[in-house]
C-alpha cells in the first residue's frame, strides 16, 4: 500500500472544552451532527471532542494543505460497532481523497488527545 501522507496532531482537552463552552458555533463549525450525537452519549465528551479535533487536524495535515480549502466538518470521525474510529470525507476534500484509504487511531490521556 502506497502512503500518500502522514499527519499527526495533539491537543489539550481543556482547550476544546473552553472553545465549546465559549460559543455554540464552535461545535457546528468543527463537528457533524452525527459526531455530536455520538459524542454527547459519552461519559467524558470533552476528551472525545478533543480526540476527533486532533484526528481532523491530522487528516488535513496528511493531505499537505492543513485546513485550507475546506471545513473541519468536512472530515467526519465516527466509530464502527467494535469501537474502531473511521473517517468519512465530504465536499472538496472527498474529491481530493478519491481512491485513497485513510487509517486513524485516537489516544487520550487526562489532559491530551492525540491522533
Ranges and model annotations:
Residues 1-115:
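Core catalytic alpha/beta fold that binds nucleotide/phospho-ligands
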Amino acid at each position: 500500500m502506497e502512503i500518500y501522507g502522514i499527519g499527526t496532531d495533539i491537543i489539550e482537552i481543556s482547550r476544546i472544552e473552553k472553545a465549546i463552552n465559549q460559543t455554540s458555533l464552535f461545535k457546528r463549525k468543527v463537528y457533524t451532527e452525527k459526531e455530536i450525537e455520538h459524542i454527547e452519549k459519552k461519559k467524558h465528551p470533552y476528551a472525545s471532542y478533543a480526540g476527533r479535533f486532533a484526528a481532523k487536524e491530522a487528516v488535513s495535515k496528511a493531505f499537505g494543505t492543513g485546513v485550507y480549502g475546506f471545513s473541519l466538518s468536512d472530515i467526519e470521525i465516527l466509530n464502527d460497532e467494535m469501537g474502531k474510529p473511521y473517517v468519512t470525507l465530504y465536499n472538496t476534500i472527498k474529491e481530493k481523497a478519491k481512491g485513497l484509504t485513510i487509517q486513524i487511531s485516537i489516544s487520550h490521556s487526562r489532559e491530551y488527545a492525540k491522533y
